[in-house]
Amino acid sequence: MSVEAMVQTMIDDLTAALGDAVKHDKGNAAAGTRVRKAMQAAKTAAQDVRTKVQADKNA
């Protein structure tokens, strides 16, 4: 997968999490759990992008 595609996937996933963020702001605790899960997935995806960029640089 290209770095561009990886970043676009992250953007799409974070955009999808916006609905739960709004619900969390209105007091929905379960939505907060979903937001935290999405943020953890974004963190993992960001690390994957960093690893790929570094590997491409060193290749």
Language model features: what each stretch is:
Residues 6, 30, 44:
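Residue-level recognition of oxygen-bearing side chains
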Residues 14, 18-21, 39, 43-46, ...:
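A structural signal for well-ordered alpha-helices, especially hydrophobic packing surfaces
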